[in-house]
């Protein structure tokens, strides 16, 4: 077999052990190099599977009782502009998207690739959005909780319990609050991906409305370019007027 053919063969995730044994006898350096690369990839995949299954430990407690459990997370607490977005996701027991993890650990491209797959494979997905005006009226913490409540209530199937990333959702359901839950639960991780992609899409839309602020790049966070635009043009209708330094800028404009 030619080395290029062997290279193509070893791209598969699972290969007949008999074939691997035969290739191990091949003394060509190129073949042995390909085998080493294959083994490393298999070890990485095995570790990924082990970690993925480990992030279902909380869900399994509920599944063992025949219960549906939803993961809840939010994104957009820290930006100076735009809404806070929450998502609630109920995953099936046979969910197997190994790359699902805390959205902060994934590239934008990976999140975008996983987003439609999560929507397709989940039992139910709900999204909640609280805009900057609500945030200014009731504070970011309470707006977070309302967005999470809205997300849970938007689920087409009602869960028996919730796994929540470090917060309590104001709904009448048993809840387990997990610190850094998006790194401990696949359900919360899936929710974090949905919320992040959904919010990023909203900020892309706002970038077209307010091109001077580069919301498609900074997602509303206080980057250098964003702050310079704020100083030059002032706040937009989507800025959080109670957040510093926006609040100080608004105060200065009023004083003028």
Curated annotation (Swiss-Prot):
GO BP terms in the entry: DNA replication, removal of RNA primer; mismatch repair
CC cofactor: Mn(2+); Mg(2+)
InterPro entries hit by this protein: RNase_HII, RNase_HII/HIII, RNase_HII/HIII_dom, RNaseH-like_sf, RNaseH_sf
Enzyme Commission (EC) number: 3.1.26.4
Domain of life assignment: Bacteria
Ranges where the RNase H type-2 domain occurs: 67-255
Main location: cytoplasm
Gene3D superfamilies the record matches: Ribonuclease H-like superfamily/Ribonuclease H
PANTHER family tied to this protein: RIBONUCLEASE H2 SUBUNIT A, RIBONUCLEASE HII
Name of the molecule in the record: Ribonuclease HII
Organism: Lactobacillus delbrueckii subsp. bulgaricus (strain ATCC 11842 / DSM 20081 / BCRC 10696 / JCM 1002 / NBRC 13953 / NCIMB 11778 / NCTC 12712 / WDCM 00102 / Lb 14)
Gene assigned in the entry: rnhB
């Amino acid at each position: 077999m030619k080395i290029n053919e062997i290279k193509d063969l070893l791209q598969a995730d699972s290969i007949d052990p008999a074939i691997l044994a035969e290739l191990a006898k091949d003394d060509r350096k190129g073949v042995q190099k390909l085998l080493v690369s294959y083994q490393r990839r298999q070890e990485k995949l095995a570790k990924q599977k082990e970690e993925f299954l480990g992030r279902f430990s909380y869900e399994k407690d509920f599944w063992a009782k025949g219960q549906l459990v939803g993961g809840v997370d939010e994104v957009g607490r820290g930006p100076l502009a735009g809404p806070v977005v929450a998502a609630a996701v109920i995953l099936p027991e046979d969910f197997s998207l190994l790359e699902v993890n805390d959205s902060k650990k994934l590239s934008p491209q990976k999140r975008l690739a996983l987003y439609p797959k999560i929507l397709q494979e989940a039992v139910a997905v709900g999204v909640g959005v609280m805009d900057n005006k609500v945030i200014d009226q009731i504070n970011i913490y309470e707006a977070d909780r309302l967005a999470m409540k809205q997300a849970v209530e938007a689920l087409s199937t009602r869960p028996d319990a919730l796994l929540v990333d470090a917060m309590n959702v104001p709904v009448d359901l048993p809840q387990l609050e997990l610190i850094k839950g998006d790194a401990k639960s696949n359900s919360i991780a899936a929710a974090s991906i949905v919320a992040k992609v959904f919010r990023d899409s909203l900020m892309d839309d706002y970038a077209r409305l307010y091109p001077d602020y580069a919301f498609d790049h900074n997602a509303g966070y206080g980057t250098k370019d964003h702050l310079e635009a704020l100083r030059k043009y002032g706040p937009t209708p989507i800025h959080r007027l109670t957040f510093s330094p926006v609040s100080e800028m608004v105060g200065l404009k009023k004083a003028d």
